[in-house]
A protein has these predicted regions:
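PLP-dependent aminotransferase-like
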Residues: 1, 80-140
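N-terminal small-domain helix-loop-helix segment of the aminotransferase-like
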Residues: 1-76, 247-248, 347-349
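Conserved glycine-rich beta-strand-loop-beta hairpin in the small C-terminal domain of fold type I
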Residues: 24-27, 243, 260-268, 278-292
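Short acidic capping loops at alpha-helix termini that bridge into adjacent secondary structure
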Residues: 60-64, 85-87, 134, 191-192
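Helix C-cap/helix->beta junction micro-motif
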Residues: 105, 165-166, 306
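Active-site phosphate-binding strand-loop segment of PLP-dependent enzymes
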Residues: 118-181
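Conserved core segment of the aminotransferase class I/II
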Residues: 194-261, 344
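PLP-dependent enzyme catalytic core of the Aspartate aminotransferase-like
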Residues: 302-309, 316-349
Length: 349
C-alpha cells in the first residue's frame, strides 16, 4: 500500500456520491476551447508557454517552471526544497494534499493554526513560533482553502523577511488568487516566497493539466532536476491548446469573478440568517466555510441523499464545518443551497 494516502482526493475520485446539485467543486466548471492547437510536435512549445506565463505575471521565463497543474507544481516545489530531513510547516486548516505530498516525500510535517477567531488570517508571529531547526518550507494557500480568506501583501512581506532570516522558503499555493482583482502574486513580494498556480480553478481548464511555479531561478532549476524523476517533459497537446487560446484568459477570468459574486450572494441569502451558524462569505470568493458544530460527515451524507453535494470540513482538519462552493449553474446552486438550509434547520439541537 502506498504510504500517506490522501483521504480528500480518495473521497473526491472514488467515494464522493453523485448528486444533481453540487456545492463541492471549488473551481469554474470545465470549459470548451474554440481554437485547437497544432497536432505537429513542436520543440518550442514549453519555451513559448513559459514566456507567456512569465508575461502574464510580470516576470521573465527563468522564473517559471511549468508543471502538471498546481498539484504537479506543488510536488516539484516541495521536492526541490525539502532536502533529506527537511521539515514542512503547514497551515491548519488546509488543503489535505498540500501537506500529505510532503509526507509522501519523506518530510516531517508540523502545523500552525489559522484560527477562526482571527477570521482565518495568517499571523507571522504564530508561524515563526512554530519553526524548528529543521524547517525548510512553510506552506500556505491564498486564497485560503477551505475558507477563502485572503493574505495581504503586508503580511506576505513579513513572511518573506522571516523566511530570509531563517534561511527557508514560503510556498504559496495561489491557484485561486485570480478571483481577487489586482492581487499581486506572492513571488513578486519577496524573493523567499514562491507561487504555484494553474489554469484550473479560475479558468475552468483543469483538463489541460497546466500549472506553474513562479520563483527564484535557482529554485526553478532545482524543480527541473526533480522533474527528471517523474514526467521528464510536459506533453505537447495541452501546451499547444493553451497557447492557441491564451488571449481568452482575461475574459474567462472576468466571467469567473462574476460567477463568484453571484454565487456568494445566493449563499448569503440562503444561509446567512440561520441560528447557531457562523457563515460570513466574502462576496467575491468562489467558496466559503460554514461552521455549525455538528457531524459534518453525516450532514454531507444527508445532503447527498437529497441530491445536494457539500464538502465536509473534516477533510481540511476542521470538523464541524462545511466548505460550500458556488461556481456552477445558478439554478442548481439555489437548489443545493435550499437542501443544505433544510438540513441545517432540522439538525438535532
Amino acid at each position: 500500500m502506498i504510504p500517506h494516502p490522501v483521504p480528500y482526493l480518495t473521497w473526491v475520485k472514488t467515494l464522493m456520491p453523485p448528486v444533481a446539485h453540487d456545492l463541492r467543486p471549488s473551481g469554474v466548471p470545465g470549459r470548451a476551447l474554440p481554437v485547437s492547437g497544432s497536432s505537429v510536435p513542436d520543440p518550442t512549445l514549453s519555451r513559448r508557454l513559459a514566456a507567456a506565463v512569465a508575461d502574464r505575471h510580470s516576470t521573465t521565463a527563468d522564473h517559471v517552471f511549468l508543471g502538471l497543474g498546481t498539484s504537479g507544481a506543488n510536488v516539484h516545489a516541495l521536492a526541490a526544497l525539502l532536502q533529506k530531513g527537511g521539515e514542512l510547516l503547514c497551515e491548519s486548516p488546509t488543503y489535505d494534499p498540500l501537506w500529505r505530498t510532503a509526507a509522501f516525500l519523506g518530510a516531517p510535517v508540523r502545523f500552525f493554526e489559522r484560527p477562526p477567531s482571527a477570521r482565518w488570517a495568517v499571523d507571522p508571529l504564530a508561524v515563526e513560533a512554530r519553526l524548528s531547526h529543521t524547517t525548510r518550507v512553510v506552506a500556505i494557500t491564498r486564497l485560503h482553502n477551505p475558507t477563502a480568506a485572503g493574505t495581504p501583501e503586508a503580511v506576505l512581506e513579513v513572511l518573506g523577511e522571516m523566511a530570509e532570516a531563517h534561511d527557508i522558503y514560503v510556498l504559496v499555493d495561489e491557484v485561486y488568487l485570480d478571483f481577487e482583482p489586482e492581487a499581486v502574486p506572492a513571488f513578486r513580494v519577496h524573493p523567499r516566497l514562491l507561487t504555484t498556480g494553474s489554469l484550473t480553478k479560475v479558468y475552468g481548464l483543469g483538463w489541460l493539466r497546466l500549472g506553474w511555479i513562479l520563483g527564484d531561478p535557482e529554485l526553478i532549476r532545482n524543480a527541473e532536476q526533480a522533474r527528471d524523476h517523474s514526467e521528464v517533459v510536459l506533453p505537447d497537446p495541452p501546451m499547444a491548446l493553451a497557447l492557441a487560446n491564451w488571449d481568452l484568459l482575461d475574459g474567462l477570468c472576468e466571467e469567473a469573478r462574476a460567477r463568484a459574486r453571484q454565487g456568494a450572494r445566493l449563499a448569503q441569502q440562503a444561509l446567512g440568517d440561520l441560528p447557531g451558524i457562523d457563515f460570513r462569505p466574502d462576496l467575491g470568493a468562489p467558496f466559503g466555510f460554514l461552521h455549525f458544530g455538528g457531524d459534518d460527515l453525516a450532514l454531507a451524507e444527508r445532503c447527498a441523499a437529497e441530491g445536494a453535494g457539500v464538502t465536509p470540513g473534516s477533510f481540511f482538519g476542521a470538523p464541524g464545518h462545511l466548505r460550500i462552493a458556488w461556481l456552477g449553474d445558478p439554478e442548481a446552486t439555489r437548489t443545493a443551497l435550499s437542501v443544505l438550509r433544510g438540513a441545517l434547520l432540522s439538525r438535532p439541537a
